[in-house]
Protein backbone atom coordinates (compact mmCIF):
# COMPACT_ATOMS: atom_id res chain seq x y z
CA UNK A 1 0.00 0.00 0.00
CA UNK A 2 1.25 3.51 -0.83
CA UNK A 3 1.29 5.58 2.36
CA UNK A 4 2.00 9.29 2.64
CA UNK A 5 3.17 10.43 6.09
CA UNK A 6 2.88 14.16 6.75
CA UNK A 7 5.43 15.24 9.34
CA UNK A 8 8.97 14.06 10.14
CA UNK A 9 9.17 14.50 13.88
CA UNK A 10 9.69 11.46 16.07
CA UNK A 11 6.02 10.47 15.59
CA UNK A 12 6.12 10.76 11.80
CA UNK A 13 9.46 8.96 11.44
CA UNK A 14 8.52 6.08 13.74
CA UNK A 15 5.24 5.75 11.84
CA UNK A 16 7.12 5.60 8.54
CA UNK A 17 9.68 3.11 9.84
CA UNK A 18 7.15 0.61 11.16
CA UNK A 19 4.92 0.99 8.10
CA UNK A 20 7.88 0.32 5.81
CA UNK A 21 8.91 -2.67 7.88
CA UNK A 22 5.39 -4.03 7.40
CA UNK A 23 5.88 -3.86 3.64
CA UNK A 24 4.21 -0.58 2.74
CA UNK A 25 5.57 1.94 0.25
CA UNK A 26 6.10 5.07 2.33
CA UNK A 27 6.88 8.71 1.56
CA UNK A 28 7.41 11.32 4.29
CA UNK A 29 6.89 15.04 3.65
CA UNK A 30 7.95 17.90 5.92
CA UNK A 31 8.47 21.66 5.69
CA UNK A 32 11.75 21.49 7.62
CA UNK A 33 15.18 20.72 6.16
CA UNK A 34 15.46 17.38 7.98
CA UNK A 35 13.85 15.13 10.56
CA UNK A 36 13.09 16.22 14.13
CA UNK A 37 13.84 19.91 13.64
CA UNK A 38 10.69 21.25 15.27
CA UNK A 39 8.91 19.87 18.36
CA UNK A 40 11.17 16.79 18.58
CA UNK A 41 14.38 18.83 18.47
CA UNK A 42 15.22 19.53 22.12
CA UNK A 43 12.69 17.91 24.42
CA UNK A 44 13.44 16.88 27.99
CA UNK A 45 14.90 13.53 26.94
CA UNK A 46 13.12 11.06 29.21
CA UNK A 47 11.27 7.90 28.19
CA UNK A 48 9.06 7.68 31.25
CA UNK A 49 6.01 5.40 30.96
CA UNK A 50 5.38 5.36 34.69
CA UNK A 51 5.18 9.14 34.85
CA UNK A 52 2.68 9.27 31.99
CA UNK A 53 -0.03 11.42 33.54
CA UNK A 54 -2.62 13.85 32.20
CA UNK A 55 -2.15 17.54 32.93
CA UNK A 56 -5.91 17.45 33.48
CA UNK A 57 -5.93 16.24 37.07
CA UNK A 58 -7.95 16.86 40.24
CA UNK A 59 -6.84 20.08 41.87
CA UNK A 60 -5.20 21.54 38.77
CA UNK A 61 -7.76 24.38 38.33
CA UNK A 62 -7.00 25.69 41.84
CA UNK A 63 -3.27 25.18 41.33
CA UNK A 64 -3.45 27.13 38.07
CA UNK A 65 -4.90 30.11 39.94
CA UNK A 66 -2.05 29.99 42.47
CA UNK A 67 0.53 29.60 39.71
CA UNK A 68 -0.64 32.87 38.18
CA UNK A 69 1.11 34.68 41.05
CA UNK A 70 4.31 32.61 41.18
CA UNK A 71 7.60 33.56 39.57
CA UNK A 72 8.52 30.02 38.51
CA UNK A 73 5.03 28.73 37.69
CA UNK A 74 4.91 25.41 35.78
CA UNK A 75 1.77 26.47 33.88
CA UNK A 76 0.68 29.85 32.55
CA UNK A 77 -2.20 30.94 30.35
CA UNK A 78 -2.60 33.88 27.98
CA UNK A 79 -5.65 34.32 25.71
CA UNK A 80 -4.78 33.76 22.06
CA UNK A 81 -7.99 35.32 20.76
CA UNK A 82 -9.52 32.08 19.47
CA UNK A 83 -12.69 30.26 20.42
CA UNK A 84 -10.79 27.00 20.08
CA UNK A 85 -8.56 27.86 23.03
CA UNK A 86 -11.60 28.41 25.25
CA UNK A 87 -13.26 25.21 24.04
CA UNK A 88 -10.09 23.21 24.58
CA UNK A 89 -9.58 24.55 28.11
CA UNK A 90 -13.21 23.79 28.95
CA UNK A 91 -12.75 20.21 27.73
CA UNK A 92 -9.59 19.95 29.81
CA UNK A 93 -11.39 21.23 32.92
CA UNK A 94 -14.07 18.58 32.42
CA UNK A 95 -11.31 15.97 32.74
CA UNK A 96 -10.01 17.40 36.03
CA UNK A 97 -11.79 14.85 38.20
CA UNK A 98 -10.69 11.62 39.83
CA UNK A 99 -12.59 9.26 37.53
CA UNK A 100 -11.42 10.86 34.28
CA UNK A 101 -7.87 11.19 35.58
CA UNK A 102 -7.69 7.48 36.42
CA UNK A 103 -9.12 6.47 33.03
CA UNK A 104 -6.83 8.79 31.08
CA UNK A 105 -3.73 7.84 33.06
CA UNK A 106 -4.43 4.14 32.49
CA UNK A 107 -4.60 4.70 28.73
CA UNK A 108 -1.43 6.76 28.75
CA UNK A 109 0.54 4.27 30.85
CA UNK A 110 -0.71 1.40 28.67
CA UNK A 111 0.60 3.00 25.48
CA UNK A 112 3.77 4.32 27.12
CA UNK A 113 4.71 0.94 28.63
CA UNK A 114 4.13 -0.72 25.27
CA UNK A 115 6.20 1.95 23.56
CA UNK A 116 9.10 1.39 25.95
CA UNK A 117 8.97 -2.31 25.06
CA UNK A 118 9.00 -1.38 21.37
CA UNK A 119 12.07 0.85 21.64
CA UNK A 120 13.89 -1.88 23.56
CA UNK A 121 13.10 -4.35 20.79
CA UNK A 122 14.15 -1.83 18.16
CA UNK A 123 17.43 -1.21 19.95
CA UNK A 124 18.11 -4.94 20.18
CA UNK A 125 17.31 -5.47 16.49
CA UNK A 126 19.12 -2.49 14.99
CA UNK A 127 21.70 -1.32 17.54
CA UNK A 128 20.46 2.26 17.14
CA UNK A 129 22.41 4.62 19.43
CA UNK A 130 21.10 7.95 20.69
CA UNK A 131 23.00 8.73 23.92
CA UNK A 132 20.49 6.54 25.70
CA UNK A 133 20.64 5.42 29.31
CA UNK A 134 18.66 2.60 30.90
CA UNK A 135 19.05 3.57 34.55
CA UNK A 136 15.53 4.52 35.56
CA UNK A 137 14.10 7.94 36.34
CA UNK A 138 13.49 9.71 39.63
CA UNK A 139 10.68 12.09 40.58
CA UNK A 140 11.62 14.26 43.56
CA UNK A 141 9.21 15.91 45.97
CA UNK A 142 10.09 19.08 47.85
CA UNK A 143 7.25 18.76 50.38
CA UNK A 144 5.72 15.99 52.45
CA UNK A 145 2.35 16.89 50.96
CA UNK A 146 3.65 16.07 47.48
CA UNK A 147 5.13 12.81 48.73
CA UNK A 148 1.84 11.82 50.36
CA UNK A 149 -0.04 12.81 47.22
CA UNK A 150 1.95 10.30 45.17
CA UNK A 151 -0.22 7.54 46.64
CA UNK A 152 -2.83 7.93 43.90
CA UNK A 153 -0.26 7.58 41.13
CA UNK A 154 1.33 4.62 42.92
CA UNK A 155 -2.06 2.89 42.97
CA UNK A 156 -2.28 3.25 39.18
CA UNK A 157 1.28 1.92 38.80
CA UNK A 158 0.42 -1.11 40.92
CA UNK A 159 -2.70 -1.85 38.86
CA UNK A 160 -0.60 -1.63 35.69
CA UNK A 161 2.16 -3.81 37.15
CA UNK A 162 4.79 -1.06 36.84
CA UNK A 163 7.75 -1.53 39.24
CA UNK A 164 8.51 1.44 41.49
CA UNK A 165 10.52 2.44 44.54
CA UNK A 166 9.32 5.01 47.08
CA UNK A 167 12.46 6.66 48.45
CA UNK A 168 13.25 8.63 51.58
CA UNK A 169 15.41 11.75 51.51
CA UNK A 170 18.55 9.70 52.23
CA UNK A 171 17.62 7.01 49.70
CA UNK A 172 17.60 9.61 46.91
CA UNK A 173 21.38 9.91 46.99
CA UNK A 174 21.85 6.20 46.32
CA UNK A 175 19.99 6.63 43.03
CA UNK A 176 21.32 10.09 42.20
CA UNK A 177 24.63 10.82 43.99
CA UNK A 178 24.61 14.34 42.53
CA UNK A 179 21.81 15.23 44.98
CA UNK A 180 24.08 14.72 48.00
CA UNK A 181 24.54 18.42 48.70
CA UNK A 182 20.90 19.36 48.10
CA UNK A 183 18.91 16.47 49.57
CA UNK A 184 17.96 18.62 52.57
CA UNK A 185 15.63 20.52 50.19
CA UNK A 186 13.70 17.35 49.38
CA UNK A 187 11.17 15.19 51.22
CA UNK A 188 11.61 12.04 49.16
CA UNK A 189 11.08 10.62 45.72
CA UNK A 190 9.50 8.04 43.46
CA UNK A 191 11.89 6.01 41.31
CA UNK A 192 10.84 3.99 38.29
CA UNK A 193 13.70 1.57 37.52
CA UNK A 194 12.43 0.56 34.07
CA UNK A 195 12.33 4.07 32.60
CA UNK A 196 14.97 5.32 30.16
CA UNK A 197 16.48 8.47 28.69
CA UNK A 198 17.97 9.56 25.39
CA UNK A 199 18.33 12.28 22.76
CA UNK A 200 15.08 12.27 20.78
CA UNK A 201 16.45 14.33 17.90
CA UNK A 202 19.46 12.04 17.49
CA UNK A 203 17.24 8.96 17.63
CA UNK A 204 14.84 10.35 15.03
CA UNK A 205 17.64 11.32 12.65
CA UNK A 206 19.23 7.89 12.84
CA UNK A 207 15.92 6.06 12.55
CA UNK A 208 15.11 8.13 9.45
CA UNK A 209 18.36 6.88 7.90
CA UNK A 210 17.35 3.31 8.73
CA UNK A 211 13.91 3.92 7.25
CA UNK A 212 15.52 5.10 4.01
CA UNK A 213 17.31 1.77 3.77
CA UNK A 214 13.88 0.13 3.96
CA UNK A 215 12.77 2.21 0.98
CA UNK A 216 11.14 5.18 2.71
CA UNK A 217 11.45 8.38 0.68
CA UNK A 218 11.80 11.74 2.43
CA UNK A 219 10.82 15.03 0.88
CA UNK A 220 12.03 17.96 2.99
CA UNK A 221 11.73 21.74 2.57
CA UNK A 222 8.25 21.16 1.18
CA UNK A 223 5.04 23.03 1.92
CA UNK A 224 2.02 20.79 2.47
CA UNK A 225 -0.84 22.76 0.94
CA UNK A 226 -3.85 20.52 1.52
CA UNK A 227 -5.20 17.01 1.30
CA UNK A 228 -6.60 15.63 -1.93
CA UNK A 229 -10.18 14.48 -1.32
CA UNK A 230 -12.14 12.59 -3.98
CA UNK A 231 -15.48 10.83 -3.50
CA UNK A 232 -15.36 11.44 0.26
CA UNK A 233 -11.97 9.76 0.58
CA UNK A 234 -8.45 11.12 1.01
CA UNK A 235 -6.31 10.23 -2.00
CA UNK A 236 -3.10 12.09 -1.23
CA UNK A 237 -1.84 15.60 -0.62
CA UNK A 238 -0.99 18.72 -2.55
CA UNK A 239 2.68 19.49 -1.84
CA UNK A 240 4.24 22.66 -3.24
CA UNK A 241 1.36 22.68 -5.69
CA UNK A 242 2.12 19.13 -6.85
CA UNK A 243 -0.34 16.28 -6.38
CA UNK A 244 1.19 13.39 -4.44
CA UNK A 245 -1.26 10.51 -4.58
CA UNK A 246 -1.45 7.69 -2.06
CA UNK A 247 -3.75 4.93 -0.89
CA UNK A 248 -3.60 6.29 2.64
CA UNK A 249 -2.40 9.46 4.38
CA UNK A 250 -1.11 9.63 7.96
CA UNK A 251 -1.20 13.11 9.49
CA UNK A 252 1.59 13.37 12.07
CA UNK A 253 1.97 17.14 12.12
CA UNK A 254 1.84 17.66 15.86
CA UNK A 255 -0.21 20.65 16.97
CA UNK A 256 -0.46 21.81 13.36
CA UNK A 257 -2.68 18.80 12.64
CA UNK A 258 -5.67 20.69 14.06
CA UNK A 259 -5.79 23.63 11.62
CA UNK A 260 -4.70 21.37 8.76
CA UNK A 261 -7.64 19.00 9.29
CA UNK A 262 -10.28 21.50 10.40
CA UNK A 263 -12.43 21.07 7.27
CA UNK A 264 -12.42 17.26 7.52
CA UNK A 265 -12.11 16.10 11.13
CA UNK A 266 -12.31 17.99 14.40
CA UNK A 267 -9.06 17.21 16.18
CA UNK A 268 -8.89 18.74 19.69
CA UNK A 269 -5.12 19.15 19.79
CA UNK A 270 -3.78 22.41 21.19
CA UNK A 271 -0.15 23.67 21.13
CA UNK A 272 1.19 23.43 24.68
CA UNK A 273 4.32 25.56 24.62
CA UNK A 274 7.31 24.10 26.42
CA UNK A 275 10.90 25.16 26.99
CA UNK A 276 14.33 23.63 27.43
CA UNK A 277 17.94 24.56 27.92
CA UNK A 278 20.87 22.37 26.98
CA UNK A 279 23.75 22.83 29.40
CA UNK A 280 27.38 21.78 28.79
CA UNK A 281 28.30 19.38 31.59
CA UNK A 282 31.31 20.48 33.66
CA UNK A 283 31.32 17.99 36.56
CA UNK A 284 29.89 14.49 36.07
CA UNK A 285 29.78 13.77 39.81
CA UNK A 286 27.54 16.79 40.40
CA UNK A 287 25.28 15.96 37.47
CA UNK A 288 22.31 13.61 37.26
CA UNK A 289 22.87 9.97 36.38
CA UNK A 290 19.62 9.72 34.43
CA UNK A 291 16.47 11.90 34.59
CA UNK A 292 15.33 13.74 37.70
CA UNK A 293 11.85 15.28 37.60
CA UNK A 294 11.12 18.14 39.96
CA UNK A 295 7.45 17.81 40.92
CA UNK A 296 7.21 21.40 42.19
CA UNK A 297 8.30 23.09 38.98
CA UNK A 298 7.33 20.33 36.52
CA UNK A 299 10.87 20.35 35.16
CA UNK A 300 12.92 17.34 34.02
CA UNK A 301 16.72 17.29 34.23
CA UNK A 302 18.30 14.67 31.94
CA UNK A 303 21.87 13.53 31.49
CA UNK A 304 23.19 12.92 27.98
CA UNK A 305 26.83 12.04 27.23
CA UNK A 306 28.38 15.44 27.94
CA UNK A 307 25.27 17.63 28.16
CA UNK A 308 22.43 18.21 30.59
CA UNK A 309 18.97 18.81 29.11
CA UNK A 310 16.58 20.75 31.33
CA UNK A 311 13.02 20.97 30.06
CA UNK A 312 9.42 21.42 31.06
CA UNK A 313 6.71 23.90 32.03
CA UNK A 314 3.78 24.81 29.85
CA UNK A 315 2.19 27.88 28.36
CA UNK A 316 -1.29 27.90 26.86
CA UNK A 317 -0.68 30.80 24.47
CA UNK A 318 -1.47 29.49 20.99
CA UNK A 319 1.02 29.17 18.15
CA UNK A 320 3.56 31.51 19.71
CA UNK A 321 7.20 30.36 19.48
CA UNK A 322 8.84 33.43 20.97
CA UNK A 323 11.41 32.62 23.64
CA UNK A 324 10.46 33.75 27.14
CA UNK A 325 13.49 34.89 29.20
CA UNK A 326 11.55 34.25 32.40
CA UNK A 327 11.20 30.56 31.55
CA UNK A 328 14.93 30.33 30.93
CA UNK A 329 15.50 31.73 34.42
CA UNK A 330 13.23 29.05 35.86
CA UNK A 331 15.08 26.24 34.08
CA UNK A 332 18.44 27.65 35.16
CA UNK A 333 17.18 27.99 38.73
CA UNK A 334 15.92 24.39 38.98
CA UNK A 335 19.06 22.73 37.60
CA UNK A 336 21.33 24.97 39.69
CA UNK A 337 19.21 24.41 42.80
CA UNK A 338 19.34 20.60 42.57
CA UNK A 339 22.68 20.03 40.83
CA UNK A 340 24.90 23.06 41.61
CA UNK A 341 28.15 22.95 39.70
CA UNK A 342 27.07 20.14 37.40
CA UNK A 343 26.96 22.29 34.28
CA UNK A 344 27.72 25.76 32.98
CA UNK A 345 24.31 27.41 32.62
CA UNK A 346 25.93 30.56 31.24
CA UNK A 347 26.70 28.61 28.04
CA UNK A 348 23.31 26.92 27.78
CA UNK A 349 21.28 27.04 24.57
CA UNK A 350 17.60 27.97 24.92
CA UNK A 351 14.76 26.40 22.92
CA UNK A 352 10.99 26.28 22.75
CA UNK A 353 8.56 23.91 21.08
CA UNK A 354 4.81 23.46 20.70
CA UNK A 355 3.73 20.13 22.16
CA UNK A 356 0.47 18.75 20.72
CA UNK A 357 -1.88 18.22 23.65
CA UNK A 358 -5.37 16.73 23.81
CA UNK A 359 -7.78 17.81 26.58
CA UNK A 360 -7.60 14.37 28.22
CA UNK A 361 -3.84 13.93 27.74
CA UNK A 362 -4.21 10.77 25.65
CA UNK A 363 -2.86 10.89 22.08
CA UNK A 364 -4.93 10.29 18.97
CA UNK A 365 -3.70 7.26 17.04
CA UNK A 366 -5.68 5.46 14.38
CA UNK A 367 -8.33 5.83 11.68
CA UNK A 368 -10.81 8.64 11.17
CA UNK A 369 -14.34 8.69 9.71
CA UNK A 370 -12.78 9.91 6.45
CA UNK A 371 -11.68 6.97 4.33
CA UNK A 372 -7.94 6.95 3.69
CA UNK A 373 -7.17 9.43 6.48
CA UNK A 374 -5.30 8.36 9.62
CA UNK A 375 -3.92 10.38 12.52
CA UNK A 376 -0.95 10.01 14.85
CA UNK A 377 -0.69 13.10 17.04
CA UNK A 378 -1.66 14.62 20.38
CA UNK A 379 1.07 13.05 22.53
CA UNK A 380 1.64 16.25 24.49
CA UNK A 381 4.79 16.10 26.62
CA UNK A 382 5.18 12.36 25.98
CA UNK A 383 5.88 12.15 22.27
CA UNK A 384 9.34 10.69 22.85
CA UNK A 385 8.00 8.24 25.42
CA UNK A 386 5.13 7.04 23.22
CA UNK A 387 6.65 7.31 19.74
CA UNK A 388 7.71 3.74 18.98
CA UNK A 389 4.56 2.22 20.44
CA UNK A 390 2.37 4.64 18.50
CA UNK A 391 4.24 3.90 15.27
CA UNK A 392 3.97 0.14 15.73
CA UNK A 393 0.32 0.40 16.74
CA UNK A 394 -0.51 2.51 13.70
CA UNK A 395 1.32 0.09 11.40
CA UNK A 396 -0.56 -2.88 12.84
CA UNK A 397 -3.93 -1.17 12.42
CA UNK A 398 -3.18 -0.01 8.87
CA UNK A 399 -2.02 -3.52 7.97
CA UNK A 400 -5.15 -5.12 9.41
CA UNK A 401 -3.29 -6.89 12.22
CA UNK A 402 -4.60 -7.11 15.76
CA UNK A 403 -2.50 -4.72 17.89
CA UNK A 404 -0.64 -5.90 20.97
CA UNK A 405 -2.58 -3.49 23.20
CA UNK A 406 -6.10 -2.12 23.29
CA UNK A 407 -6.39 0.63 20.67
CA UNK A 408 -10.05 1.57 20.25
CA UNK A 409 -9.97 4.23 22.99
CA UNK A 410 -6.92 5.91 21.45
CA UNK A 411 -8.58 7.01 18.21
CA UNK A 412 -10.25 10.31 17.39
CA UNK A 413 -13.60 8.54 17.65
CA UNK A 414 -13.67 9.14 21.40
CA UNK A 415 -14.21 12.83 20.62
CA UNK A 416 -16.86 12.21 17.98
CA UNK A 417 -20.49 11.23 18.25
CA UNK A 418 -20.68 7.46 18.10
CA UNK A 419 -17.81 6.77 20.48
CA UNK A 420 -14.84 4.49 20.07
CA UNK A 421 -13.53 2.91 16.90
CA UNK A 422 -13.14 -0.87 16.62
CA UNK A 423 -9.80 -2.26 17.81
CA UNK A 424 -8.92 -3.24 14.25
CA UNK A 425 -10.23 -1.74 11.07
CA UNK A 426 -9.25 -2.36 7.43
CA UNK A 427 -7.22 0.62 6.29
CA UNK A 428 -9.32 1.36 3.23
CA UNK A 429 -12.71 0.30 4.50
Curated annotation (Swiss-Prot):
Alphabetically ordered keywords of this record: FAD, Flavoprotein, Oxidoreductase
Is Nucleotide-binding one of the keywords? Answer: no
Q: Which cofactor does it need?
A: FAD
Reactions this protein catalyses: a D-alpha-amino acid + A + H2O = a 2-oxocarboxylate + AH2 + NH4(+)
A single Gene Ontology biological process assigned to it is: D-alanine catabolic process
Q: Name one Pfam family in it.
A: DAO
Q: SUPFAM superfamilies, alphabetically?
A: FAD-linked reductases, C-terminal domain, FAD/NAD(P)-binding domain
Molecular function (Gene Ontology), one example: D-amino-acid dehydrogenase activity
Q: So where does FAD get bound?
A: 3-17
Question: Looking at the record's lineage, which domain of life comes first?
Answer: Bacteria
Q: What is its EC number?
A: 1.4.99.-
Function summary: Oxidative deamination of D-amino acids.
PANTHER family for this protein: D-AMINO ACID DEHYDROGENASE, SARCOSINE DEHYDROGENASE-RELATED
Full protein name: D-amino acid dehydrogenase 1
User: What lineage is on file?
Assistant: Bacteria, Pseudomonadati, Pseudomonadota, Betaproteobacteria, Burkholderiales
The UniProt gene name for this protein comes to dadA1
Amino acid sequence: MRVLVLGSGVIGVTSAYYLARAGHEVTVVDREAGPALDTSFANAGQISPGYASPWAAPGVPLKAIKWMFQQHAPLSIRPDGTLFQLQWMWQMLRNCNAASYAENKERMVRLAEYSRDCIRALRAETGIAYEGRQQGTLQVFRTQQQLDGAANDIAVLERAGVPYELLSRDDLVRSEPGLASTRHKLAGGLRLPNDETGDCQLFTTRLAAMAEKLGVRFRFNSRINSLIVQNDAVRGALVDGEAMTADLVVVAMGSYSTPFLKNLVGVPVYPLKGFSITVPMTDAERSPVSTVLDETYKVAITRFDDRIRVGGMAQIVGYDKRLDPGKRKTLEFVVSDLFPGGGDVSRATFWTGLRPMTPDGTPIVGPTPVRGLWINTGHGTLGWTMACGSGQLLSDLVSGRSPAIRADDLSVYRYLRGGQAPATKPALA
